[in-house]
C-alpha cells in the first residue's frame, strides 16, 4: 500500500472509525495525538509575567442540530443519556441543548464522534 492509497482509505472512514484509528496508533507507537502547546515568545524585559492559564478539565457536550437523520441521533442520545424515548425526542427536537455536562475531554470527544457519525452537529464547551 502506498501513501496515496492510505490517505484515500482514511478519507473514506467515518468519524468514529478515525477516533478508534488514532487511539490504536497512539497505543501501538506510544505517542500522543494531542497538539503540543506552542511556546509563546520570551517576555519583553520589564514585562509582568502572565498569570498561568488553568486548563479546563470538565466539558459540556451541546447538540446544536440533529441533522437529517433524527432517528439515529435520537438512538445515540438515548444511549448516552439513559433518557426515555419521549424525553430524548424532546431534547433532540429542541436544539441547541446540552446532552451531557461535566464530562472529561476524552468522554466529550467520544460522544461528539458518535453523534457526528449519525449526522448531528455537536459542540464541546
UniProtKB/Swiss-Prot annotation:
One of its GO terms (biological process) is translation. Belongs to the bacterial ribosomal protein bL12 family. This is Large ribosomal subunit protein bL12. Homodimer. Part of the ribosomal stalk of the 50S ribosomal subunit. Forms a multimeric L10(L12)X complex, where L10 forms an elongated spine to which 2 to 4 L12 dimers bind in a sequential fashion. Binds GTP-bound translation factors. The gene is rplL. Forms part of the ribosomal stalk which helps the ribosome interact with GTP-bound translation factors. Is thus essential for accurate translation. InterPro entries: Ribosomal_bL12 (IPR000206), Ribosomal_bL12_C (IPR013823), Ribosomal_bL12_C/ClpS-like (IPR014719), Ribosomal_bL12_oligo (IPR008932), Ribosomal_bL12_oligo_N_sf (IPR036235). One of its GO terms (molecular function) is mRNA binding. The keyword Ribosomal protein applies. Keywords: Ribonucleoprotein, Ribosomal protein. The keyword Ribonucleoprotein applies. One of its GO terms (cellular component) is cytosolic large ribosomal subunit. It comes from the Bacteria.
